[in-house]
Every structure is written in structure tokens, then in C-alpha cells.
Amino acid sequence: PYVDEKKPSVMYADAHLAAAKRAAVESAILLKNDKRVLPLKETVRTVAVVGPLADAPYEQMGTWVFDGDKTHTKTPLAAIKEMYGDKVQVIFEPGLAYSRDHTTSGISKAVAAAARADVILAFVGEESILSGEAHCLADLNLQGAQSELIAALAKTGKPVVTVVMAGRPLTIGKEADLSAAVLYSFHPGTMGGPAIADLLFGKEVPSGKTPVTFPKMVGQIPAYYSHNNSGRPAMRNETLLKDIPVEAGQTSLGCTSFYMDAGFDPLYPFGYGLSYTTFKYGDVKLSADELKKNDVLIVTFDLENTGDYEGTEVAQLYVRDKVGSVTRPVKELKRFTRVTLKPGEKKTVTFELPVSELAFYNINMEKVVEPGDFGLWVATDSQSGNEVSFKVVD
């Protein structure tokens, strides 16, 4: 009937902490990296660590910790000082007390600290209480004065590396535009600090991909890659609000689906994520152009690391059923795999896709594979890649 007093020591065993760190490393997503500001170069001697989530151990544990013990959590500030303090001088000035803080008096102190640094590391996002079951928000912008903080830091002219800790995709387009790099860690957990520090300083290479679509603004929601096709198929590059002439005719914009003030593309598509290295996809080869319902489609392609770092790419396979008895999604993720490559290394990657996995429920609620034409993409995200085609026959 009593708690085993030895359990906490088991829970925070070295192997478990290492697993927590590995999970945080592999789930962090590099969304932007202009001029390869990351990983931080050896020429960087001073970093300014700012933001309300730079040293908030409870908040980085996430939504479902309940009675989690924050004393075992290592924050980014603590990790950077401990692991890289011998290489860089760390100046800490949070600017805001917590993520919902509207008090702007501390921003000037953060800006002063940033002016003394070579690079600014800004840790923003949302407290864990703002996410989770029954914790909905109508506004997905950064809470409090965090946007003002990022804007003020950007005015220093120093490169801003924005690290976002959050439980959902926030609408950070404005902040991303002001940042040289953006790393999205979600709520990274107990070992989030060391994981983020190693990613920033290049001991680890980002490999995470967006598990959801990031909208430009809340008006784009619902925004997801696997939406059904419609009688007005969406066009990615459409007329925006500023381009419409005065007294334009009602039919002048056509009949496709798009937002006049935002276009159709999201801020970041499903499956998106950058690396410190680059990858090249070779031509996709199919085992057959025509298959029967009991067949297995073999998909092969070459993947090459064309950059300077060893890295891991998450290669993704998408399929589209072009015509069905009911409306089908424009794309569906069917396979993905992590491929680790050294600089210059090339591997042949193989996906096996049984035709039976192309089944869906028809109007009679029968699970069926319908004959017809299909499109297939192998790509780095849900909006990339060249289409190849195959056919399913009876």
C-alpha cells in the first residue's frame, strides 16, 4: 500500500536521463537557419540568454507531469553554463518574469545584455499550464510581451536565435521573420536544457520534423496536409489581398480555395524540419507501374548527405488516390524512416507498401481498395518532392 522509496532513484537513473535527453534532441525542430548562424561558431565568445523560459524548470516539463519534480530538471541556462561556460561568456537577463507577463520594464535590461553579446538566445513560448486537455486558446500568438521582447532584441542588430517551448504550434511568423534561426523544442522535458544546448553548439544535429501543420494565423485553421480534395482545389500561389485592383469583378479571382490575406500555404508544412547538413533525394523507382490488390509496391531511391555534418534525415512517403467513390485526401503519409549519413555518404532506401494499405471505407462502410490511378511522393516534407504515378487494377 506504500510507495517504494527507491523508485525516485530508479526514475532518475542515468539511463533514463540519457533517454530523456535523446528524446528531446530528436524531437526538436529547426525551422529556420539563415546564414547558418547555427550551430554557434567558435568565434562566438559571448551569448545573451534571455526570455521567460530560459530558466523555468517546471514549465519545460510539459502538460502531463502533474506532480513532477522540477528539482531534477535542467534548464537551457543551467546547461549552457555547465556544458559550454568554458567556451563562451553567458549573460542572463530574462526580460519577462513568465510567458504571460505584460510588464515591459525588464525588456530594456534584456536589450542591454543583448547589446554586449555576439549572439542572442531567446527562450520564449508558453507555460505548461497553457496547453493540454481542456486548455484551449483562441489566440495562438506568443502570450504577454514576448513579441515585444523579440522585436526589441532584433533592433540591436545582433543575430537572434529564438527557441520556442510550447505544447502546440504557435503563430510565430512575425517572430521568425525577426530571428536568424528558430528552434522549436515543444516542452522538452527534464533533460531539455542539455539537449537544446548541444543542438545550439553543434554537438547534436537537428533531425526533428513538424508533427502538425503550423498555420500563419488562426484563420487558416483547420490547416492539415491530408485535407480532402474539393470542387475548388487549392492553389498554393494565389492572388493576395494587396494585389486585388479596386472595383475588381466578383469573378476575377477565380474559383479556387485560398485566403486573400494569407494565401494557402501554411507557415510550416507537416513533416518540415531543417538540418545543419543538406540531403539530396535521387529519382524514385517503383517495382511496378501497375499492381493488383494483393501486391506489394517496392519503392526505392538514393539519399545522399551533400553537406558538411553527419546528420539524420526523416524521409517520408506520401500517396494520393486520384479518384475515388468518396472524396479522398490530397496526400496521406504512408511510410517514413530515419536515415543517418556521414558527409558525402549515399544510401539506397527502400519502402514496402502493400496495396491493401490503400484501402478506405466507402459509402457503405466497407473497407475497399478501389482500382484507379495513384500519385506517390518521396520527400523531406509534405509539400516537397516530384510525383510518380502507378495504377491499381482488379
Residue ranges and their predicted role:
Residues P1-G62, G68-L77, K81-D86, I91, ...:
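Secreted, periplasmic, or luminal enzymes acting at the cell surface/secretory milieu
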Residues V10-A13, I91-L178:
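Hydrophobic helix-and-loop "lid/oligomerization" segment in the mid-to-C-terminal part
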Residues G144, K293, P343, E370-P371:
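Surface-exposed loops/turns
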Residues V296-T300, K346-T350, G385-E387:
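Intrinsic-disorder/low-complexity, polar/charged segments enriched in Ser/Thr/Lys/Arg/Asp/Glu/Gln
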Residues E310-L317, R328-P329, N362-I363:
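Short, hydrophobic/aromatic beta-strand segments
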Residues S325-Y361:
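Intrinsically disordered, low-complexity Pro/Gly/Ser/Thr-rich segments with frequent PxxP/GP/PP motifs
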Residues P354-D394:
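Terminal connector regions
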